[in-house]
Curated annotation (Swiss-Prot):
Cell compartment(s), UniProt: Cell membrane; Cytoplasm
Source organism: Staphylococcus aureus (strain NCTC 8325 / PS 47)
One example of a Gene Ontology biological process annotation: protein transport by the Sec complex
Gene inactivation effect: No effect on cell growth, significantly reduces export of the cell wall protein SrpA. The small amount that is exported seems to be glycosylated normally.
Gene: secA2
Residues noted as binding ATP in the record, renumbered to the chain: 84, 102-106, 496
Name of this chain's protein: Protein translocase subunit SecA 2
GO molecular function, one term: protein-exporting ATPase activity
Reactions mediated catalytically: ATP + H2O + cellular proteinSide 1 = ADP + phosphate + cellular proteinSide 2
EC top class named in words: translocase
PROSITE patterns: SECA_MOTOR_DEAD
Domain of life from the UniProt record: Bacteria
Documented EC number(s): 7.4.2.8
Length: 796
């Protein structure tokens, strides 16, 4: 139900936007008379007006949108409607446009993409999967090219494709790029691992439009993109600890709060662990690896459920997105948790790899100069959009009134009774010829219903979010007469279901939903599969006390009331009191689920702040190194002096042997100078002596280079090596630290404070280590040349 104040605020926002729409319409009438050449020429004119400062993007908007609108009609045969103009204005303003399914978001996005591309700084359309990005790009590319702009898919759509040198740079030089959030995120991380200026390819992120924006920057906000590096030293405790955890009893040995994903040992559990593993103090420094593995095993055993949080598929653990139900192949839980789940399932434990680079979607999109988003369910997340990204949500009116009937929830005592009723209703609908879309939360439930329907001679298409392209085609056909489709909540998302001939007269598409999802936005998305563009249709959600939402988030004990099961099922389902009570339980459970989701995202955002700031500083330093173009005239004495002062201050007593050892380890392998003249009691004298050796070694290295060009490459490479090796250690350490702090004090403000304090201390240590390694690398690295005459650097 919409709050009156929300409606009023939205109308005020629309009122100012409609004034701009009027100006677009005026220009639209004018440009209709332009020849094709005259219309195309406007792009060149707009660029010149922007470059000269005569216009800004805002002042150009009405005329530019009118040009893009007319071009859409001439090239694509589609003429953007006024509601699409409203959405396009919201997108240019950097806000969230709530547009219902079937209202033409793909066409809407072309106008702000065209306008912002005129600046020459690049624009991006970011969606959730490769199929949708490729589909929308191929559909809209002719429009952009007709208007004189360049457009590209942000990736090569070939499995395991190996990019050639300069290929990605060529992609990102286009005016408009269609890509996915995952592809863009990994490209950002890879770009910042480049070892030369020529190896970088990603320009500054200027303007982006995110499709399904709530799914990407709210639901997936906590999911970090990770590039893995070398294997960590693997613990052999996973299977042993799993056997110990199997002996523990809840509320005797451990306590848990499933709603908060918290679990911890009680005193009896600590004593049991000390006895089982024969350790005196479980929380001693010597036993910390054991404690970590016990915590991981407890979380794997009790907080992660098979077929809910993950599948066992082809011998691998495949994670499931809890909100969307989509499988996440290739994604792994960090800090040993993935390996603990493998041990729980009796599988061979995979190698736990260190983290080389990581970023969350939340921080990725904050790198954009400006970004906006489209979704059918933005209003429900408006407070989060504003708190995290300073975005408002504007509800764009539909072109035609929504005719879909959203029926009241149907309430049942148990899942078995619910399933029987659902099958009965599906059979009745199918007999009328009405297309039916049955949506489940899990793939397991979808497979069950598909099998039952086949046994009842009702052919059906099963979609469980595995093959995106194939399922998009199948979901598009779900509106045909007599069609029966069984799908998980994410299968075929982003694809319109158009009604076949004769279906409108039957009442349109019937959407039957097996249970409420953990987030009401997803419920709305599922209902929105029916009733596109004013089509008739219906939706109904079936609920029971056995539903996952109730089991996971509700503290009600109604399901445990034995008297409930002595009553007649039909009479009970017709009881207003019972129906009202169960609905209240479900609504409360969903609200708790949503609140916990918000808190978890807030917590993730808090934890991410340290690594985000550190990442920005490190990447800035990398870029400064990559910009070195005259290494011969660079003065590295200040850097070396800092390092040598660290050395003399860290040593309690400076001796001749220690200083000579330091020189061999950090400055020169061939040092043979007599040091009798050095006063080792005078720290400044030692620093001066070390600086002399540093300058001699630097001069020798420069002499060994064939040219200033190769010396420049040498300096860049050895400095980057120092930065990268220290940063990789820091990133991996912060990942481990976050997991450790989370396990100890999940959800507490002091946990966040502790994390930031330790993260800052470790960053200061890292910056000192970078300087030390820079000095060591520039002195002790060697350069040779291969058969082709290319330089090869050998690091110490």
């Amino acid at each position: 139900m919409k709050h009156k104040l929300d409606v009023t605020i939205n109308e005020l926002r629309l009122k100012s936007i409609r004034k701009i729409v009027k100006r677009i319409n005026t220009w639209s009438d004018e440009v209709k008379s332009y020849s094709d050449d005259a219309l195309k020429q406007k792009t060149i004119e707009f660029k010149e007006r922007l470059a000269s400062g005569v216009d800004t993007l805002d002042t150009l908007l009405p005329e530019a949108y009118a040009v893009a609108r007319e071009a859409s009609w001439r090239v694509l045969g589609m003429y953007p409607k006024e509601v699409q103009l409203i959405g396009a204005i919201v997108l240019h303003e950097g806000n969230i446009a709530e547009m219902q399914t079937g209202e033409g978001k793909t066409l809407t996005a072309t106008m702000p993409l065209y306008l912002n591309a005129l600046s020459g700084k690049g624009t991006y359309l970011i969606t959730t999967n490769d199929y949708l990005a490729k589909r929308d790009f191929e559909e809209m590319q002719p429009l952009y090219e007709w208007l004189g702009l360049t457009a590209s898919l942000g990736f090569v759509d070939i499995v395991d494709y190996e990019y050639q040198k300069g290929e990605k740079r060529n992609i990102y030089e286009h005016d408009i790029i269609y890509t996915t959030n995952g592809r863009l995120g990994f490209d950002y991380l890879i770009d910042n691992l480049a070892d030369s200026a020529e190896g970088k390819f990603l320009p500054q992120l200027n303007y982006g439009i995110i499709d399904e924006v709530d799914s990407i920057i709210l639901d997936a906000a906590q999911t970090p993109l990770v590039i893995s590096g070398a294997p960590r030293l693997q613990s052999n405790l996973f299977h042993i600890v799993k056997e110990f955890v199997d002996t523990l009893i809840e509320d005797v040995h451990f306590k848990m709060k499933k709603t908060k994903k918290e679990i911890w040992l009680l005193n009896q559990g600590i004593e049991a662990a000390q006895s089982y593993f024969n350790v005196e103090d479980l929380y001693s420094e010597q036993a910390m690896v054991l404690v970590r593995n016990i915590n991981l095993a407890l979380r794997a055993q009790y907080l992660f459920e098979s077929n809910v949080d993950y599948f066992v598929y082809n011998g691998d653990i495949v994670l499931i997105d809890r909100i969307t139900g989509r499988m996440l192949p290739g994604t792994k839980l960090q800090a040993g948790l993935h390996q603990a789940i493998e041990a729980k399932e009796g599988m061979e434990v995979s190698t736990d790899k260190s983290v080389m680079a990581t970023i969350t979607f939340q921080n990725l999109f904050k790198l954009f100069e400006s970004f906006s988003g489209m979704t059918a369910t933005g209003k429900l997340g408006e407070s989060e959009f504003f708190d995290l990204y300073s975005k408002i949500v504007v509800q764009v009116p539909t072109d035609k009134a929504i005719q879909r009937i959203d029926e009241p929830d149907k309430v049942f005592r148990s899942v078995d009774e619910k399933n029987i009723a659902m099958i009965h209703d599906i059979v009745e609908l199918h007999e009328t010829g009405r297309p039916v879309l049955l949506i489940t939360r899990t793939a397991e439930a979808a497979e069950y219903f598909s099998k039952v329907l086949f046994q009842m001679d009702i052919p059906n298409n099963l979609l469980i979010a595995q093959n995106v392209a194939k399922e998009a085609q199948m979901i598009a056909e779900a509106g045909q007469i007599g069609s029966m489709t069984v799908a998980t909540s994410m299968a075929g998302r982003g694809t319109d279901i158009k009604l076949g001939e004769g279906v409108e007269a039957l009442g349109g598409l019937a959407v039957i939903i097996h249970e409420h999802m953990e987030n009401s936005r997803v419920d709305r998305q599922l209902r929105g599969r029916s009733g596109r563009q004013g089509d008739p249709g219906s939706s109904c959600i079936y609920i029971s006390l056995d539903d996952y939402l109730v089991k996971r988030w509700s503290d009600s004990n109604l399901a445990e009331n034995n008297q409930l099961y002595s009553l007649d099922a039909q009479r009970l389902s017709q009881s207003n009191l019972f129906n009202r009570k169960v609905k209240q339980i479900v609504v409360k459970a969903q609200r708790i689920s949503e609140e916990q989701g918000v808190k978890a995202r807030e917590m993730a955002n808090e934890f991410e702040k340290s690594i985000s700031i550190q990442r920005d500083l490190v990447y800035e330093e990398r870029n400064r190194v990559l910009e070195i173009d005259d290494a011969e005239n660079q003065d590295f004495k200040a850097l070396a002096k800092d390092v040598f002062e660290m050395f003399v201050n860290e040593e309690k007593v400076l001796t001749k042997s220690r200083v000579v050892e330091y020189i061999y380890q950090n400055l020169s392998f061939q040092f043979n100078k007599d040091v009798a003249c050095v006063n080792f009691k005078d720290k400044q004298a030692v620093v001066t002596f070390l600086l002399e050796q540093f300058e001699k070694q630097l001069a020798l290295n420069r002499k060994n280079m064939q040219s200033a060009y190769y010396y420049n490459i040498f300096v860049q490479k050895v400095f980057l090596k120092a930065i990268d090796s220290c940063w990789l250690e820091q990133v991996d350490y912060l990942q481990q630290l976050k997991a450790s702090v989370n396990q100890r004090q999940n959800g507490q403000r002091n946990a966040i404070f502790e994390y930031h304090r330790v993260a800052l201390d470790s960053f200061e240590v890292m910056t000192r280590n970078i300087k030390k390694r820079m000095v060591k690398n520039i002195c002790q690295s060697m350069i040779t040349f291969d058969k082709e005459g290319m330089p090869v650097i050998h690091f110490p």
